[in-house]
A protein has these predicted regions:
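Pocket-lining segment of extracytoplasmic ligand-binding domains
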Residues: 109-110, 118, 191-285
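Bacterial lipoprotein signal-peptidase II cleavage site
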Residues: 18-30
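Hydrophobic core
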Residues: 9-17, 325
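Positively charged n-region of N-terminal signal peptides that target proteins for export
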Residues: 1-10
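Secondary-structure end/capping motifs
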Residues: 254-328
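Short, glycine-/small- and polar/acidic-enriched structural segments
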Residues: 32, 38-41, 45-179, 184-186, ...
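Conserved C-terminal helix/tail region of periplasmic/extracytoplasmic solute-binding proteins
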Residues: 319, 323-346
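Short, solvent-exposed loop/beta-turn-alpha elements that line the ligand-binding surface or hinge
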Residues: 74-81, 232-240, 307-315
Length: 346
């Protein structure tokens, strides 16, 4: 208990930056007379009860890929899933650490933080959201490449967290000094960024989905997406991917219920593909579960990069991304990069 409390306290600090049942005993038998040995019918071993997997997700892009599983859980009690949805990571992760949840979707860097804090108590099952950051321009048409950002001011959110580190990485890999060649003006909320653009009549912003869609709704057709940070990362990332979120499983649960984990991976792969192929219906489910408002979700889903990347491909994508974060700020990933055991199935 002391260890758990310690872990939870450390986790809270970090977030400020950003039955093994045996078979029943065989009944005693009396030896049959040697003259009439009747053959006994074989007895079947008892079947283990199905495991109900407790899922957890946050509102926003990290939860979008799971909405089909949530709906299935509501419609069919035998689906094998129950779920919890929270508004922030610091509401969700304590439930995982206290073994109230089994599998959760969390920001990628937080996954590494939790691995370090729990000393390997969690493992990454899949990357489920790639980059959701976009650079947009309002009132002008000057930007068509990263190089065009030189000398410009970029309004953004996420100072001291992954959005800043992702932007700095892309700028640096394209030959720009983030501290000299551009001005990054950080605001506390996306709404502040929109307000500044509206007041000035023009400007450049880096925002995550679905806030980009929401901003376009307020600023109109003169607000246009010019660059995808995820796509620009892929051009220079040497095999790594701009990773927003991944799916974690408690190590103990994975060891005790490997079949349930494999079933989940299969079900989630289907669910993620379903979301991308059924945007209208998926958008309605996002609204139902209060992940993202339905009208916004329907426009944002195609740009949220919902995926299911597992195994060695996951390790390359996620591991490379965590390396980028580690090089800029080790605390962003919990002080150390995860060990090989972090990557399930790799």
């Amino acid at each position: 208990m002391k260890k758990l409390i310690s872990v939870l306290c450390l986790l809270a600090l970090t977030l400020s930056m950003l039955s093994g049942c045996g078979a029943p005993a065989a009944p005693e038998t009396t030896a049959a007379p040697e003259t009439t040995a009747a053959a006994e019918a074989p007895t079947e071993a008892p079947t283990a009860a199905p495991v109900s997997v407790r899922l957890g997700a946050m509102t926003g892009p990290t939860g979008i890929g799971m909405v089909k599983l949530f709906e299935d859980a509501d419609q069919d009690a035998a689906s094998g899933y129950s779920y919890t949805i929270k508004g922030a990571a610091d509401e969700l992760t304590p439930m995982l650490l206290q073994e109230e949840l089994d599998i959760v979707s969390v920001p990628a860097n937080l996954a590494s933080v939790l691995y370090n804090k729990t000393e390997g108590g969690v493992r990454a099952l899949a990357v489920n959201v790639l980059g959701v950051l976009y650079i947009a321009e309002f009132g002008s048409d000057d930007v068509s490449s990263v190089a065009d950002l030189k000398g410009k001011t970029i309004y953004a959110t996420g100072k001291g967290s992954t959005p800043e580190y992702f932007l700095r990485y892309v700028l640096t890999r394209n030959g720009l000094d983030p501290d000299k060649d551009v001005t990054i003006d950080f605001k506390s909320e996306p709404s502040e960024v929109v307000a500044v653009l509206n007041a000035e009549g023009s400007g450049i912003a880096m925002l995550p989905q679905p806030y980009v869609i929401a901003a376009a709704g307020q600023l109109g057709e003169n607000f246009k997406i010019k660059l995808s940070v995820s796509e620009e990362w892929e051009k220079v990332g040497a095999g790594s991917l701009c990773t927003t979120a991944c799916i974690l499983v408690r190590t103990k649960f994975a060891e005790e219920h490997p079949e349930a984990v494999e079933k989940f991976l299969s079900d989630f792969a289907f669910a993620a593909a379903w979301v991308n192929e059924n945007v209208e219906e998926a958008g309605e489910l996002c609204g139902k579960f209060e992940i993202v408002k339905a009208p916004v979700a329907k426009k944002a889903i195609p740009k949220c990069n919902i995926v299911c990347i597992t195994g060695s491909e996951m390790r390359s994508a996620l591991g490379g991304c965590l390396q980028v974060l580690f090089e800029q700020n080790p605390k962003a990933v919990g002080g150390n990069l995860p060990g090989d055991d972090f990557y399930y199935g790799a």
